Amino acid sequence: MARIMIVDDAAFMRMMIKENLKKTGFSDFVEAGNGEEAVSLFVKTRPDLVLLDITMPVKDGLTALQEIRESDPEARIVMCSAMGQESMVIEAVRLGALDFIVKPFKPERLVQTVRNVLE
């Protein structure tokens, strides 16, 4: 089963994502609360997929995306953004994100995106 890293500064959002993915059979998770933790944990744990929030303290999602892709150009990363962050989403795709999910999102959209990227 795939290892999924969930990166969001909001603990409730990490929990919600994890619970929705658990319901569909995913069980191996790594969590980070900011971009700096995400980069460090990515190098240590090499997850199959990273769900990465854009707006976070310490190190934002775009910077973390760049650093993760520098350490592993094949890293599979999906950005999570709030409404109104379209320019950041475009930049994230330019930097190598494979997809994005706009918050708030339906659980079905989350699961389908994760499955599509992992195929």
Regions found by a protein language model. Give the residues of each.
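Charged docking surfaces used in two-component/phosphorelay signaling
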Residues: 15-23, 90, 108
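Short hydrophobic/Thr-rich beta-strand motif most characteristic of the beta2 strand and flanking loop
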Residues: 26-33, 41
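Acidic catalytic/metal-coordinating carboxylates
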Residues: 34-37, 60-63
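Active-site beta3 strand of CheY-like receiver
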Residues: 45-51
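Receiver (REC) domain active-site loop signature in two-component systems and cognate sites
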Residues: 56
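C-terminal output helix
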Residues: 87, 105-114
